[in-house]
Amino acid sequence: MAVIANRYEPLELAPAGAAVKARDMQTAQTVMLRPITRVDERLRALFHPSLVTIFDIVHDGAATFAACEFVQGRSLRLIMGGQPCNGRRAAEIVAEIANAVAELHSRGIYHGAITIDTVLLTAKGKAKLDLVHATDSAESTDLDQLRVLLKDLTGYERPDLADAGSAAVLAARLRSQ
């Protein structure tokens, strides 16, 4: 397999245009190389425990890739398999992601694509927000998406969970000010 951008050695075969697990030959770190069309440069090297870190953005021929933290985990959609999540666990996940969103907002960055597809759960159960899908949006969009995430996790709206979601959203808003 050909080295990408003279730095990343693919560790597995992947279809053209798909993400590929690779080894950074400079650091010996395992990363995910994700093909991208655009990414906000401010996301590079933004470190937070609930954000998937983008270490580098590289060009290889006509293709552009984000070299991202390799996360041993899967998206919430895959984990849930169409079944709702326990209410307490749903609130914990939303609180973790709200904390990450607060970090983004404190830097003037808005994600705009917070869904069960862009939130990953690690093998240890930690929620991480994928930054590759971030779009240029507004604070209110992110906060609304946190509420929808809570609803999607539980399968329906419950007043007690709406309160937990509101608390997480409020915490995110306060932390970003």
Question: What is the predicted role of each segment?
Answer:
Residues 35-45:
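AlphaC helix of the eukaryotic protein kinase fold
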Residues 76-85:
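AlphaC helix of the protein kinase catalytic domain
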Residues 61-75:
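Conserved short submotifs of the Hanks-type protein kinase catalytic core
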Residues 93-94:
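Activation segment signature within eukaryotic-like protein kinase domains
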Residues 57:
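Activation-segment/catalytic-loop signature of the eukaryotic protein kinase fold
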